[in-house]
Amino acid sequence: MAFKVGLLGLGTVGTGTVEILRDPAQRHPLLQELVIHKVGVRSLDKARSLNLSADLLTTDLDAIVTDPEIDIVVEVMGGLEPARSLILKALAHKKHVVTANKAAIARFGDEIFTAASEAGVYVLLEAAVGGGIPVIEPLKQSLCANRINTVIGIVNGTTNYILTRMQTEGGDFGEILADAQQLGYAEADPTADVDGLDAADKIAILASLAFSGRIKLSEVYCEGIRQIGAADIAYAEKLGFVIKLLAIAKRESDQQLQVRVHPTLVPKTHPLASVNDVYNAILIEGDPIGQVMFFGRGAGAGPTASAVVSDILNIAAILKVGRGQVTQADGTPLLDPLLACSHQHYCTIAPMSELVTRFYARFLTQDYPGVIGKLGTCFGDHQVSLESVVQAGIRDGLAEIVVVTHDVREGNFRKALDEIQRMTTVANIASVLRVL
Amino acid sequence: MAFKVGLLGLGTVGTGTVEILRDPAQRHPLLQELVIHKVGVRSLDKARSLNLSADLLTTDLDAIVTDPEIDIVVEVMGGLEPARSLILKALAHKKHVVTANKAAIARFGDEIFTAASEAGVYVLLEAAVGGGIPVIEPLKQSLCANRINTVIGIVNGTTNYILTRMQTEGGDFGEILADAQQLGYAEADPTADVDGLDAADKIAILASLAFSGRIKLSEVYCEGIRQIGAADIAYAEKLGFVIKLLAIAKRESDQQLQVRVHPTLVPKTHPLASVNDVYNAILIEGDPIGQVMFFGRGAGAGPTASAVVSDILNIAAILKVGRGQVTQADGTPLLDPLLACSHQHYCTIAPMSELVTRFYARFLTQDYPGVIGKLGTCFGDHQVSLESVVQAGIRDGLAEIVVVTHDVREGNFRKALDEIQRMTTVANIASVLRVL
Ligand SMILES: NC(=O)c1ccc[n+]([C@@H]2O[C@H](COP(=O)([O-])OP(=O)(O)OC[C@H]3O[C@@H](n4cnc5c(N)ncnc54)[C@H](OP(=O)(O)O)[C@@H]3O)[C@@H](O)[C@H]2O)c1
Ligand SMILES: NC(=O)c1ccc[n+]([C@@H]2O[C@H](COP(=O)([O-])OP(=O)(O)OC[C@H]3O[C@@H](n4cnc5c(N)ncnc54)[C@H](OP(=O)(O)O)[C@@H]3O)[C@@H](O)[C@H]2O)c1
């Protein structure tokens, strides 16, 4: 049997994908039954590292997603449009889809999965989160007996690289970002990474799978790492923490989830604390499995293509054994309930003001004896119980005060901060971070 | 639809399995379509923590595996016989099988998978390695596009617990084993764990999946942790290592694998070095994914039952969508080429003498100036190049000498040791360990 694959995109991931497809030795024998039928790109003139026969390449992507010969469309072009429209059109033409596009899935997952269900085809997306690290398929299949309670991930390699270097070198965010850009670890426009948007896309996808509901991306709280200073890294270190950009999804109650991305103080003994450089890791806590963690490279041509091609093979295996021969009343093939994303309702996400967490905050204040007392009283007035208040030093003639709270309601903490902000003795709230 | 499950065994894992099956809330909805049809045990009189209706329990296990109503047989009784015969009989009666029995699969995998292929049914075994940690399914599905080069695991919780305590407390093997037995972390008869046999079963299974061939268990080299002394842990620590019982499978060439279990010096910076206590982790290195690691609890009722029930659900999902409706010429359902273990040939395992590795060795010798020179010359004569030789101290009036080699052929190293053993100046080769 031969399964025909149409690729949309031949950039980093597309090239990695073709390289695996053309080199099946010592890989799964099913690879030999895959045929690259067409590859869609923007420009036919671009120099390519791969030696592809010219008649495979086309700029007519519409022709790929409607080609009656193609079984599986692989979307590795990225971006929102035309990626979204092409995926929907491929599904309408009853093609299975494999995609690495977290941005499109996080935003248009509802339309895309509804269209897939109606067409009786699969949309697989292992590459969209954690690069090659298996996490989508484990959530769907290997962990399906569990009640998932928490998913916590380091899912953005660029920010983890920057934070790791800030940690080891003691440098400031701006200079290390500039260096990371030079070295190719950060994009020229770093916004999606450093402002946490990419991580937010990914945790929205993971939360949707873990809690079997749809997630409105606009409800995912998202805070990046631009405001982290060398001082915060150093104080955190002294307190026994490292700072990581965490993407967190948590079942708060039967009705509500927390879904959020923000830099977080992580205890050094926590399994995520030692995940450094561009590595990603996803920690899942479920009942009755307890904690499991998945670790590896979250990006790059090889790891990402590993996930893309594995998804293609999983679909080829289904096609081969004729799964989908059982049909529903309207003739649509019945989809595997573990592999399809058939949930329809939206999860309710709790507002951040209701979050209960520990906080770390750093204040610059006038250097006189009553200040710590004033801060303490203000927090107390708002039911914010403190674990420690330390005058850590003097900076620019101001006293630097570091506060760590016990578990408190974020809403209460914010009200106290509002009041502190207005105190004439407080020059600056230099940083506010949550503690895991 | 309802899928009928027959359980063989209601001990630790069986009880955990029933607990999940009876509590589907917030778990995958497919759970609600599973029905426990029969549960086989040894004794009907035994007090059970579960309140199971009496007509479910039976001591007639044969009747379960031949019951025409049962779709899926779950073998969680353990041991070699009658487990093997019951599994084979279940397969002959075209029942899908889920098992947690690493001992039986490592020994009888060839018979069992051949019988499953002939019957056109699946044998799933996620629980057999790493408890709840997804590793079998990722190897079969999520990583299937890769050429796997290495699998290295900490796959035995008991030995990892003992070694971690030896590391943190500085105690000796014997006393910590006794304490571990008291605390329930080690069995009364600890042989299978501390002599590495359980880890050997597991790496044989992982190697078979990673390298798509069968493995003769008798060819798996296996060395336990009884001989590790507090002195070795302390010297390793000074050299920047921790000692872990590693199970290793490696592609040495197109023709040959290494498959081995032994205590190993692991650099403290290695991802496996910080896997402590009863936790397990499996590190897989593949092309093009690079390194990925899976971490979690490798045993216990909850984690193991998570894997067992997930396997049951995976089979139920297949049954539900009617996969297997495409049949071969003889009418047997065609099995999913990713999920079935259809490889027939045996892998060739290289003899240990051909292994190229670094070694650590500790000698007790007479305390006079020429001894280090004699050792060095002897190693040199056998092409064993040394990284360091240190007289580490005096023990019982003897000089304690610690040697670390560069990468050397194990055969050469052993010949040198034979010669050293016979030197009158050398009282004792106190320990020999490999270095990762
Ligand atoms: N790179 C990674 O490490 C990584 C990791 C995980 C997920 N992903 C995801 O994978 C996807 C692809 O990423 P990438 O890094 O491979 O991107 P890339 O290197 O920029 O490649 C994009 C490819 O798509 C083609 N393309 C883009 N827009 C097109 C259009 N409108 N019409 C026709 N062709 C178009 C480009 O054609 P030309 O070649 O002619 O310009 C190029 O071949 C993205 O969704 C990304 O988020 C990437
Ligand atoms: N425990 C773990 O953490 C763990 C982790 C991974 C894998 N596993 C594997 O899971 C399997 C089960 O382990 P377990 O710890 O659950 O064992 P267990 O607690 O000893 O339970 C064994 C069960 O099987 C029944 N049984 C045993 N031999 C029988 C026979 N000949 N006829 C009828 N019933 C028989 C026993 O019946 P009675 O109740 O009447 O005595 C008991 O219910 C083993 O293969 C083990 O290697 C266990």
Where in this protein do the model-derived segments appear?
Chain A
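Short, ordered loop/turn segments at secondary-structure junctions
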Residues: 42-44, 78, 102-103, 110, ...
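N-terminal glycine-/serine-/threonine-rich beta1-alpha1-beta2 phosphate-ribose binding loop
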Residues: 1-93
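A conserved regulatory-domain signal marking ACT and ACT-like small-molecule sensing domains
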Residues: 312, 318-436
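Rossmann-like NAD(P)H-binding beta-loop-alpha module
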Residues: 117-198, 205
